[in-house]
């Protein structure tokens, strides 16, 4: 199998896994994975047909009366797929990404992008990264001044890395 074929296979598996985690009809999914050799995180938001409201994945068990244990197992399967995707880059002697944005629609549109920022060795934690992502992706600023300032710090940090 070529690298592109392997990518396509994993992309399909990721999209199918996320789709299976959402127990209602959905329109768009916005996924972010931060992974390095020491671990990481994966989270996603989705929209429902006719609405632009973002639904955060951790609300699914409570909203739809789904076992937290079952949902956590599905989430671990999803995390493992993103690790597999990252390992594929290593196998091909490509630089392993540290973040992957994975967006797709019900109609089958897919947009995947990778970044190589060393988040783990930065001063920015999980909440800061998630707030920055929501701001960059959706224009949503966090509620507290402290969190807003963290988003601005991350923005500055990334600008400096790009120079």
Curated annotation (Swiss-Prot):
Gene3D superfamilies: BH3703-like domains
Entry keyword annotation includes Cytoplasm: yes
S-S pairs: none
Pfam family, one: YezG-like
UniProt GO cellular component terms: cytoplasm
Principal place of residence: cytoplasm
Keywords on record: Cytoplasm, Virulence
Domain of life: Bacteria
Cellular location(s): Cytoplasm
Main function: Component of the type VII secretion system (Ess). Also acts as part of toxin-antitoxin system. Counteracts the toxic effect of EssD via direct interaction.
Subunit structure: Interacts with EssD (via C-terminus). Interacts with EssE.
Name the UniProt record assigns to this protein: Type VII secretion system protein EsaG
Species of the source: Staphylococcus aureus (strain NCTC 8325 / PS 47)
């Amino acid at each position: 199998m070529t690298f592109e074929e392997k990518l396509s296979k994993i992309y399909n598996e990721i999209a199918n896994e996320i789709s299976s985690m959402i127990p209602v009809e959905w329109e768009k999914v916005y996924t972010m994975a931060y992974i390095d050799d020491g671990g990481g995180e994966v989270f996603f938001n989705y929209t429902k047909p006719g609405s632009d409201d973002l639904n955060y994945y951790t609300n699914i068990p409570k909203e739809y009366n789904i076992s937290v244990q079952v949902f956590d197992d599905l989430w671990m399967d999803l995390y493992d797929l993103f690790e597999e995707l990252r390992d594929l880059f290593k196998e091909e002697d490509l630089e392993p990404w540290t973040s992957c944005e994975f967006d797709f629609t019900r109609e089958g549109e897919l947009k995947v992008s990778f970044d190589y920022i060393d988040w783990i060795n930065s001063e920015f934690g999980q909440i800061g990264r998630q707030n920055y992502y929501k701001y960059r992706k959706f224009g949503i600023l966090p509620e507290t001044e402290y969190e807003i300032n963290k988003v601005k710090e991350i923005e500055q940090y990334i600008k400096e890395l790009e120079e």
